[in-house]
């Protein structure tokens, strides 16, 4: 082990003396003291430039069953209640349709955040108002 260490030191000395004889200047030798620091700095910059930071783009990633509806998932929202004869339906059927729809959102009528009536039920007011006075949500 000692022989190897001496061998490395002697090679360093040879390189140093060769460099000194080539330049005839002590300026290069002074800058050689900072060489390890400069190499380390460049290695750190190289590593940082090739790492991939995680940047949030704010885009929606579809993960399947969601607790909210943002238009990106592929659940069919029109076929939840098929047994309604009247296009508006009775209040209980409207609630049932809302409950079945909101099962996509994780539970009961109001647990999911908002109630969106089934399209085949009109605007959700049982025909009392014209469709344009519905919930304000474009169905």
From Swiss-Prot:
Residues 61-139 are annotated as: Disordered. InterPro entries: Miracidia_Ag_8I. Residues 64-85 have a biased composition (Acidic residues). This is Immunogenic miracidial antigen 8I. Belongs to the immunogenic miracidial antigen family. It comes from the Eukaryota. Residues 90-103 have a biased composition (Polar residues).
């Amino acid at each position: 082990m000692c022989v190897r260490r001496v061998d490395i030191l002697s090679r360093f000395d040879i390189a140093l003396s060769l460099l000194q004889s080539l330049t005839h200047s002590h300026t290069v030798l002074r800058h050689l003291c900072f060489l390890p620091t400069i190499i380390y700095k460049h290695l750190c910059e190289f590593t940082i430039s090739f790492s991939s930071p995680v940047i949030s783009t704010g885009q929606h990633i579809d993960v399947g069953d969601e607790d909210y509806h943002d238009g990106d998932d592929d659940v069919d929202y029109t076929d939840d209640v098929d047994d309604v004869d009247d296009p508006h339906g009775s209040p209980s059927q409207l609630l049932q349709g809302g409950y079945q729809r909101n099962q996509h959102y994780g539970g009961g009528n109001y647990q999911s955040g908002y109630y969106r009536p089934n399209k085949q039920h009109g605007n959700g007011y049982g025909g009392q108002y014209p469709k344009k006075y519905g919930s304000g949500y474009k169905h």
